UniProtKB/Swiss-Prot annotation:
This is Defensin-like protein 147. It comes from Arabidopsis thaliana. It is found in: Secreted. One of its GO terms (cellular component) is extracellular region. Its main location: secreted. The lineage of its organism: Eukaryota, Viridiplantae, Streptophyta, Embryophyta, Tracheophyta. GO terms for biological process: defense response to fungus; killing of cells of another organism. Residues 1-24 form the signal peptide. Disulfide bonds join 34-82, 46-66, 51-79, 55-81. The keyword Lyase does not apply. Belongs to the DEFL family.
Length: 89
């Protein structure tokens, strides 16, 4: 009885290790990165609400960030969508 339990436990541990390894590989393939998106062509500035809206339309898990401010810390010139993206093949 003890050997059957020991064998079953060993097989269970090996199975769990393999499953965790596969899940880890899948999650690792998604990478956190930012991609630039165009800003309002009329003003040439990034509006946070518009930037967030574009990013949400692109993919659910992305966050919009206005970037590249002038020397006074105002007038952002770039919209970036950051988050987990699927792998590039």
């Amino acid at each position: 009885m003890k050997k059957i339990f020991q064998l079953s436990f060993t097989v269970f541990i090996i199975f769990i290790s393999l499953v965790l390894g596969v899940v880890g590989n899948v999650q690792q393939k998604r990478s956190n990165r930012c991609i630039d998106f165009p800003v309002n062509p009329k003003t040439g500035l990034c509006v946070l609400k518009d930037c967030e809206s574009v990013c949400k339309k692109t993919s659910k898990g992305l966050e919009g960030i206005c970037w590249k401010f002038n020397a006074k810390g105002k007038d952002p010139k770039q919209c970036k969508c950051c988050g987990l993206w699927p792998p590039l093949y």
